[in-house]
């Protein structure tokens, strides 16, 4: 999944067809035998809504332009196991892109288990209760 993300990043620049970015990212996942686990496009734009064009998707006619905001979020979803996705917000710049998301990509940071989730929720509730 992270390699698919890198393949999408490598293509982001003004003038790139969004369908080509999707083919690079999701094509890699298909090549690796993950095609049956793909449930959505590689990304989408942001603006007045959080899901709008340009659509980074197969069949999209959209082309990137400078100052567009797009998500890069290739993902695989395996029944009875879970989903794997890292969603990044990316600004298209004159010469390429700037990733506005700064989150670790190591496996431990990307793993959310039930235990970790409940610990986070409990911690948030305690902080709220004590006013911090």
Please annotate each region the language model reported.
Residues 1-132:
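Active-site neighborhoods and metal-handling regions in enzymes and metal-associated proteins
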